Structure formats: C-alpha cells, structure tokens
A protein has these predicted regions:
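Conserved helix-turn-beta segment of the N-terminal RecA-like "Helicase ATP-binding" lobe
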Residues: 4-28, 227-234
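Inter-Walker segment of RecA-like/P-loop motor cores
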Residues: 14-56
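Conserved RecA-like ASCE ATPase "motif II neighborhood" in helicase/translocase motors
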Residues: 40-81, 259-265, 280-282
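SF2 helicase motor core recognition
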Residues: 52-55, 279-293, 313-317
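Conserved helicase ATPase motor motifs in RecA-like P-loop NTPase domains
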Residues: 71-73, 85-102, 132
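Interdomain helical connector at the RecA1-RecA2 junction of SF1/SF2 helicase-like NTPases
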Residues: 104-208, 225-226, 230
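Conserved C-terminal RecA-like helicase domain
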Residues: 175-280
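Conserved segment of the helicase C-terminal RecA-like domain
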Residues: 307, 313-331
Length: 331
C-alpha cells in the first residue's frame, strides 16, 4: 500500500478475516530483513519502506506482490526500488481508477499481456451494485446563482497539469488568484453554507446519515467552518486537513495527532455522536471508509481519478441507504 491509513485499514481487514501467518512491517530494516531471510509469510507494508532498497533482496520466482491503489507511486523511484528488490516476483495491481497517461501508466506497470486492454480481471460499478457491495451515486445540481465561471476553472485546472513555461506559470498564478477570490467571496460562502445546512437538515439528517463538505483549499475549510458555526451547533462539524502545526503555521490550531484524528473519525462513524459533517480539502478523499457518510457537498474543481475516488466515499453500504449523493456547487 502507499499510505499509513491504508496499511492500518488492510491489516485490520486481514485480522478480521482471521488470516493466518500474517505480519505487519514496522520499519524499512524489518522489511529488508524479512525479504533477505526468506521469511514465508503474508507481509503487509507501505511501498515507502522499499525506499532504501538499493539491490536485490530476494530473487525467488514464487513471491506474489499485491499492490493496493496501484495507480499511485508505481512509476517513480519507489516503484523501481520495489521491482529491483524483488525482480522475479509476480505483480498484481488493484485499483478502481487505472491511469493511462504518458508519465503515469498503470497498464505499463501491471498490465496483463493476455488482455488487449491490459486487464487481468475487472469488477465494475454495476457489478458491485448488483452484489450490494456499494450503492449507486446520484448527483444534484445547485442553483446557478451559486456557480462561478466553470470554463475558467477547467482551463486553469488543465494548465496546472500541463508543462508550463515560467511566463505561463506567472499567468496561471494570476488566474488562479482570481478564481480563489471568486470562490471565497463572503456572499458566496454564506450562500453555500446556508444551502448546505438547509439541504442537510431536510434530506440527510432525518435519514440518520452524515455528510462531507469538500472545499477549495485550507483557507476555505476555515471560512466554511466559521459560516457553518453560525447556522448549526459548532460540535456538528469539524475540520480535517494537513497542517504542520509548527511555529508560524496559520492553521496550527486545526492540527490533529494521529490518535486524535482516529478518535474524531470514530465519533463521526457513530450515529449517536453529534458530529455530523467533516470539512476537508484533500484529506479523507481516498481510502476513507465511513458507511454513514451519504452526502458529499463538493465545492472544489476535481477531475479524472481524483474526482472518482472522492465521490465514492459516499457509496458504502449502510442501513437505510439507497444511494450516495453528490451536491455539486461548481457545475
């Protein structure tokens, strides 16, 4: 896996299934020792623990490597080191959002030669809905008065991902600043938060579900939290975002330790806890599992696999849930 939270999540899943002969790796040295000593176990690790592997650790040809979230961290240095360490291993990539681009290509990293499209096996959204593993997604458009210039956002987003000259980067910074001003306009923030609260109280809370509000950036997280606190009890919402918490960090008050964040998320998963809404910008948009989450209020330009992974936070099976709902404020 490529993140600590996924490591914890998968380890818990294996433990719940009572899988024998399993071991979690605590650091890079332990991983290297296990590989070099040819330990025959199911080893769960993050790919980052291959970061110091400079040469072959084990050249056996009956090693199986299963990579979760295989569309990430595979084409760069970490993926190369893992393949160097285990040169003859069979690699299986698991992902809901394979990427096929020049610089990031899941099919190059894992693709099956036996299939024209590079897949070994596919399990679609329709398959998961049929099996009641997930719920369908519904989308709700918001009144156009809350929208901003979507074409400008799309163009700016496209430029961000392209190779830019220094002059182009300067021009983009100016356009992005204008976009941020539009998104953070006090009247717009107030209008969206009013809509969020009204919608939540009418369509989400009565059914026993909870929500997530995805904002443009960390400043927006704070702006929306302050606006929401005027419309609903402060304990009903919480910010979860990346922050160093160091001296001079303007978002230090929102920093949570790993334990505190886990406690907060456990409270969120509890239907009897007053915490009803998480305000985020980049955290909890992948890998976060909370079946009680039914509605995502989306006020951030997103696309491709990032968008797909984010909106799927809402489609987990939960008592009484018929669908996940995405309320889009950018159109």
């Amino acid at each position: 896996v490529d993140r600590i939270d996924l490591d914890t999540q998968i380890t818990a899943t294996f433990n719940a299934a009572d899988i024998p002969n399993m071991i979690g790796v605590s650091d890079r040295k332990e991983l290297q020792d296990l590989c070099e000593k040819d330990i025959r176990k199911i080893i769960i690790t993050t790919i980052h623990k291959f970061g110091e592997a400079e040469s072959v650790l084990n050249d056996r040809s009956n090693i199986i490597v299963m990579v979760d979230e295989a569309h990430r961290t595979q084409e760069g240095d970490l993926g190369r080191r893992m393949r160097t360490a285990l040169p003859n291993a069979f690699l299986f990539g698991l992902t809901g959002t394979p990427i096929n681009k020049r610089d990031r290509n899941t099919f190059w990293a894992f693709g099956a030669d036996e299939d024209e499209q590079g897949y070994l096996s596919r399990y679609s959204f329709q398959d998961s809905i049929r099996d009641n593993a997930t719920k369908p997604l519904h989308f709700e458009a918001v009144d156009v008065k809350l929208h901003i210039d979507k074409d400008a956002i799309d163009e700016a987003y496209k430029n961000i991902t392209d190779e830019l000259s220094e002059q182009d980067r300067d021009d983009l910074a100016k356009r992005a600043a204008k976009m941020a001003v539009l998104i953070k306009a006090p009247s717009r923030v107030q209008a969206i938060c009013r809509h969020v609260v009204d919608h939540f109280k009418e369509k989400v809370e009565p059914n026993g579900f909870k929500a997530q509000l995805v904002t443009f950036d960390r400043e927006c997280c704070v702006l929306y939290k302050k606006a929401l606190d005027e419309l609903m009890p402060p304990e009903a919402s919480a910010i979860v975002m990346h922050t160093s918490g160091g001296k001079g960090d303007e978002y230090a008050e929102w920093k949570l330790s790993k334990d505190d964040e886990e406690k907060l998320l456990d409270r969120y998963r509890d239907p009897n806890d007053p915490l009803q809404m998480l305000i985020v910008t980049s955290k909890l948009l992948t890998g976060f599992d909370a079946p009680i989450l039914q509605t995502m209020y989306l006020d951030k330009p997103m696309k491709d696999h990032n968008l797909l992974q984010a909106i799927c936070r809402t489609n987990r099976v939960y008592a009484g849930k018929t669908h996940g709902l995405i309320v889009d404020y950018l159109g």
